[in-house]
Amino acid sequence: MQIRNVYGIDLGTSTVKIYDLKKDTITKEKNMIAIRNREQVIAVGNYAYEMHERTPSNIEVITPMSNGRIANVLMVEAVLHTLLHRCTRHMGYRPELYFSVPCDMTEIERRSLVHFICVISNGNHLFAVAYGIIFFSFVIVSFFRS
C-alpha cells in the first residue's frame, strides 16, 4: 500500500510543527521572521530566532502570532510558505495538508486563515482539525495505516 503525501501543520504562537506521514517525523521551528526595512524577508523559523536581539536597526525580528491569535496575516503566510517549502521540498503531486486550528476563532481570523491556507496549498486537499499535533498525528497514522 502506497502512503499518500500527507502533512499536518500546527500553527502555534511560539512554534510551528509540521508532521510528515511518510517519514513519520515532526519538524519544530520557531514562529519568527526577520525582515529588512519592513519589506524583505531575511530569515524564517529557527534561523530568525538565532538573529533575535542581534540584528542591526534596519532588520526587525518579529513573531507573527500573539496570544494564540494571528497578529500579521502576511507574515504568517510568509512563515508557513517558507517552512512548508523547507520541510517538504519533494512533496510530490497534490499532498494533503491538515491544519490544527483553534475552536474559538473570530470570523475575521477564520477568513484570514482560510485565505492564506488557500494561497499556500495551491488548491491541494485541505483539512482543518481542532486538536493539537500529537493527537492529530495519532489520528492520521492510525487512519492511513489501518
Regions found by a protein language model. Give the residues of each.
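Nucleotide/phosphate-binding catalytic cleft detector across ATP-hydrolyzing
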Residues: 1-13, 17-29, 34-42, 46-146
